[in-house]
Amino acid sequence: ENTAPTEIPVIKQNAYPYNYVTCSQAQTLASGMVKSENYTSSLMFGVQWDLVLKYLETKGTAQADLKTDSASIGNYYDNLWEITNENSKYAPNGSGWTSGARGKKELNTSILLSTGASETFSKQGIYDIAGNVSEWTLEYTSNSYYPCANRGGVYSNNGDVYPAADRDNGTTTFYGTIIGFRVSLF
């Protein structure tokens, strides 16, 4: 079942993650989000992602939580959490959205969440920098078959496999429930 969002992407709590996009679709969508001569919108550059992680570290997030195992700060397969946010949404195995608080998640289960479903997954007001969906960036890899780069981790994998600092790759045609994007304004 396709769980692609039907809402306009926004930066706020309890929104559907904008997933099911290829890296080029993500850049097209991101660059068209702001219609202004004063601002530009784009996918995040890899260095911007790294600077956000460094900022979070200077504000008290442990380096190990960002670089080694992000299960304690993000939505991952191998962690336990309890969502009490009545305005949140969730999709077991990334399919079939349900509105309302999910309650307790069992260990080793895959549940896609709306943005900021838990304050635990919000660091300095930045939602879901670790886990939930991996995010396309403007980086390119050295692998010609997998030229597109994405950052962060996914709800269906472990926090020590794909921590917040992870830099992964994908094909130009890859899309799915586990990949989305984050917009930067400058």
Regions found by a protein language model. Give the residues of each.
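Surface-exposed recognition segments
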Residues: 121, 129-186
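Short aromatic-cysteine micro-motif
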Residues: 1-128, 186
